[in-house]
Amino acid sequence: VSYALMKLVMTSTPLAVVGCGFDAGNAADVVTAHVLAMYIPSFFTGHLIARFGVEKIVATGLVILAGAGAVALNGVHLENFFVALILLGIGWNFGFIGATTMLAGAHAPHERGRMQGLNDLIVFGGVTFASLSSGGLMNCSGGTPQAGWASVNLAMAPFLMLAGGALIWLTLRPKDA
């Protein structure tokens, strides 16, 4: 879910930044900050998972993704774009690395290759759908870049709730002995 939500928002970001009155250089700077925020945490995400547990890191990622949406919905100033996209990158990192860790730990070694392939099909199918949906939401949601940007960010909410619910279920279900 974190990968698809990141793609949903990131795809529309340059259009939204320029549509809200900033130049292409500003859009490039926002996306650059976002990409750095996606990958720099990788130096310590594994250590955080080892220390706090994978479920807590995934939950933190979901909360950070929700925070990204909240910041984006709070205004269309350049600072909002920067903060929202930096949070989006960090949330993606925690969610994606955490979920990948969960997947690896949920299967026997002989099952992992097949499960990774199925997971990649689902993940990148979701990313494709999110990317296509992003343009539709951005351009068909009221006629203004501000309305489109709001629609893109509001679209994250149901998926964050579903992912959060699934994570709660995984955390509370009885563990195999």
Question: Model regions: which residues?
Answer:
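Short amphipathic helix-loop junctions that connect adjacent transmembrane helices
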Residues: 11-30
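Helix-to-loop junctions at the C-terminal end of transmembrane segments
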Residues: 41-54, 138
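Structural signature of the two symmetry-related core transmembrane helices
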Residues: 56-71
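Helix-loop junctions at membrane interfaces in 12-TM secondary transporters
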Residues: 73-84
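Intracellular juxtamembrane helix-capping segments at the cytosolic ends
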Residues: 94-108
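A late C-terminal transmembrane helix in Major Facilitator Superfamily
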Residues: 111-142
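A membrane-interface helix-boundary motif in multi-pass transporters
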Residues: 136-160
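Multi-pass alpha-helical transporter architecture, strongest
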Residues: 156-177
